[in-house]
Amino acid sequence: MAKKEEKENKSGDISLKLGPRLLDLLAKLQQVELEDFEMEVKELELRLTPAAIATAAPRAVAPPALPAKVKPTTILEEEFTPPIEEYPGKVREVVLGATKSEGGSRSKKFVIGGADTPSFYIFEKPPVHPPVVAIDTFDIKVPLPKAIRMHVEEVMEDPAEWAKMAVNKFNADVVTIHLLSTDPLIKDASPAEAAKTVEEVLQAVDVPIIVGGCGDPKKDSEVFEKIAEVAHGERVMLSSVTLDMAEAGTLAKPAKAAKEHGHLILAFTALELNNAKELNRRLYEYVPPESIVMDLTTAALGYGLEYSFTIHERARLAALANDPELQHPVLSGSTNAWAAREAWMKLGPEFEPRELRGPLWETITAINLLLAGVDIFMMMHPAAVKTMKEVIENLLTMGKAKPEKIADWVTVRI
């Protein structure tokens, strides 16, 4: 027994034995306070039985109630004024054709140009003058795609009848007569012969006309001089003069004749605005600016149409920015679309019918340049002409923006 107590003392553990009575008394108390008590121990370990009384948690405070969201019952009403930008410059107005009271014999004339906004900015203001559509005819029988030939085959050897058909059947605003017979490499027709053809066309139709040359700088100069004299007072457009004429020294002759007899000059350059400005500067020496129309070159769909669009758009914006050398109406030879083989050649069945593909090719070419700012179009296929005139009419009748309908721009149907 002594050994056991000794062992317990060596281990450092002390057991305090209390009687049952004392334990009962202690059970009724929540705390015990000892006075004059000393304890010498080497190591003290306290084991506390979990108390039955838990520390009370703080009382949760309810957050203040958020005010109820008020849902809008009406749309915010605010006045909207469409922005209208003013431009410092504008395109000059050019008159094509002359009526009897003006010294000519046309039943009507067309004012082209005059734009003071980018093309068809209807939300700013409608175009001053609607674009004009001319139909191409030729003074000799020329090879044409079947899709075109089938409509004009019966009149291809008679320029006057061809012009009549263009006006009476296909509703052309203007007729273009191309004098290909004057080409030295084709028939080399004389200026007098060419002038006679133009006279016949003037007598056959009463709309303004455009007279096209053969592209030879020397021959065109002679032909235009003669035609200007024969068509005195009719205010025809001579198509076209070029920088090649200036370099060949033949520009002065047709330009002086145009001024003397009251005609227009079509200034042709190939997709280069600097050249267009240079040619215009040279023409200013002979004719007033109000007699000049620009042809900046029309490249067909698939053959550089995007370049033509860019050049025409740049020319319009330059005119609005007050560049006087580019403030001239612009003409597009949209018939050039037929130079694209894809417009008429035989392809796979998925590209048929060719009779529809060709007119679409010409129409798309023309509409793109319409939106770039072209004022007058040379076209050929009757369906393309009809579609183009309808597109122009639809754009013109859209009217200005209606601010009161801004909120109704979309509807949903389920």
Q: How does the language model describe each region?
A:
Residues 10-14, 21, 350, 384-390, ...:
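C-terminal accessory extensions appended to soluble enzyme cores
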Residues 131-137, 173-177, 207-213, 234-241, ...:
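Hydrophobic faces of well-ordered beta-strands that scaffold small-molecule active sites
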Residues 244-391:
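Catalytic alpha/beta core domains of metabolic enzymes, predominantly
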Residues 143-148, 171-201, 205, 211-217, ...:
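Glycine-rich, proline-tolerant flexible connector loops at the mouths of alpha/beta enzymes
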Residues 167-170, 198-204, 225-232, 252-261, ...:
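Acidic (Asp/Glu)-rich catalytic clusters
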Residues 15, 19-22, 26-38, 132-161, ...:
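Active-site mouth loops of central-metabolism enzymes
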Residues 2-153, 407-414:
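N-terminal amphipathic alpha-helix/helix-capping segment at the start of soluble metabolic enzymes
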Residues 155-167, 223-224, 360-368:
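Short, acidic/polar
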